[in-house]
């Protein structure tokens, strides 16, 4: 759901919600995780996921892309067993430190959201996938952990969420 760039009419919101619900049903049918884009719509998203969880149980799983909410909102997504993904924005604002400190490490993922929100020290340049390491470094710093420990945990999280098996 993205209520930021669209005209916020009830018709537009309703249509987005209907399509999201269809998408959730398809993901569950094929046992695939959801990658959730949610902007200016956390309450609506939480309500839909909670309702669909009642219908589908733990087969419904996924990740909240570019999580930019509060610790209170994070807890609600975590209770639904959705991981939270952090971007380069965490490297240039302290607004997310509380969330990063409190989210269980096994529920954290990282991303770049290329070409936007380039992390420090690359601000002003086009974002690239290679810069995700800066997001990992920031998480390690905020949590007072070793970067390798964070990398290892995030890799395990990705494998779990996407059901990737080691060969």
Across the structure, where does each feature detected by a protein language model lie?
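Active-site neighborhood of phospho(di)ester-bond hydrolases with catalytic His/Asp-centered motifs
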Residues: 35-36, 63-64, 86-87, 109-112
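Short acidic/histidine-rich active-site segments
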Residues: 106-128
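Mid-to-C-terminal alpha-helical segments outside catalytic/metal-binding sites
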Residues: 26, 131-167
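Generic structural signal for helix capping and beta-alpha/helix-loop junctions
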Residues: 44, 94, 117-118
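Divalent metal-binding pocket/active-site signature
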Residues: 1-80, 98-103, 122-127, 144-147, ...
């Amino acid at each position: 759901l993205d209520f930021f760039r669209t005209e916020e009419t009830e018709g537009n919101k309703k249509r987005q919600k209907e399509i999201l619900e269809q998408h959730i049903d398809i993901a569950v049918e094929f046992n695939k995780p959801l990658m959730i884009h949610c902007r200016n719509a956390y309450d609506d998203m939480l309500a839909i996921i909670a309702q669909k969880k009642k219908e589908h149980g733990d087969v419904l799983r996924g990740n909240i892309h570019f999580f930019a909410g509060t610790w209170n909102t994070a807890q609600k997504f975590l209770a639904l067993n959705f991981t939270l993904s952090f971007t380069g924005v965490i490297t240039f604002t302290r607004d997310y430190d509380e969330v990063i400190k409190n989210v269980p490490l096994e529920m954290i993922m990282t991303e770049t959201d290329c070409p936007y929100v380039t992390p420090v020290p690359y601000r002003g340049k086009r974002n690239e996938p290679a810069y995700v390491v800066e997001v990992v470094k920031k998480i390690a710093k905020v949590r007072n952990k070793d970067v390798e420990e964070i990398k290892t945990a995030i890799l395990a999280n990705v494998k779990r969420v996407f059901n990737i098996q080691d060969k």
